[in-house]
């Protein structure tokens, strides 16, 4: 049985860092120290295989009062096809610290269908949103 924990001490940061730095389209090249700082200052969700190995991850940046940004969501390739991304999102979406918030945001290139199942929609007023983007923060171009 796969399990999910919000305990950052349980994370296999080597596995999480490898995926984000080497395989993700959004955080390629992220330094380990940057990931460690992000984990320390976020609500994290580790997805674990029955043998305890890291199978997936999600991170939420939030003030726990009005806003949450969902990011760094992934299930490792060897564990895909088992509805685990939905299990991970169910844990995120039902977490007590994320209830009653005015707004949840995320960015995705390829998982719109998954997130729409949890109430995410296109921005209602995209003209209201701006970003200050650093296109190559880790020395390696990223896709978002």
Residues covered by each model-derived region:
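Conserved acetyl-CoA pyrophosphate-binding loop and the N-cap/start of the following alpha-helix
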Residues: 79-88
